[in-house]
């Protein structure tokens, strides 16, 4: 276990129950802008999930996509806030969810796990994968 993950658990275990309970899980929320939209496809997202899960030591389970693949042209999404790919990668301890917006060159990523993980590694890898020029990050301890 990396040092920062061990520190997260150690701090949680030392907190008296009357103050803040030990976290149930951890959620990293990443809002990425100025992305390379060529990374917004099933093949690229498969690669992202594999690399991310390996980097933060999570076991991949089922994965699902929601996009316009196989949808007739006249039924495909055309609005900037809906045209893109969404994917859910279930992991043994919860999930990684990605929503991409092709026309806005934006990606929204949620990484949630009952197990602690290195959020700095996850953020760096995600920002690099999507080639984002900007990344807004929120980290939540779920109790």
Where are these regions (language model features)?
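Polybasic/polar functional segments that serve as interface/processing modules
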Residues: 1-143
């Amino acid at each position: 276990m990396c040092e920062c993950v061990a520190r997260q658990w150690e701090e949680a275990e030392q907190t008296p129950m009357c103050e803040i309970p030990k976290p149930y899980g951890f959620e990293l929320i990443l809002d990425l802008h100025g992305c390379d939209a060529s990374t917004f496809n099933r093949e690229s997202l498969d690669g992202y999930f594999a690399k991310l899960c390996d980097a933060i030591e999570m076991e991949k389970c089922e994965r699902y996509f929601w996009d316009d693949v196989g949808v007739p042209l006249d039924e495909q999404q055309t609005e900037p806030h809906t045209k893109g790919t969404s994917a859910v990668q279930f992991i043994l301890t919860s999930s990684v969810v990605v929503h991409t917006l092709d026309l806005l060159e934006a990606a929204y990523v949620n990484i949630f796990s009952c197990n602690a993980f290195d959020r700095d590694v996850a953020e760096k890898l995600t920002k690099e994968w999507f080639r984002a020029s900007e990344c807004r990050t929120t980290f939540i301890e779920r109790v």
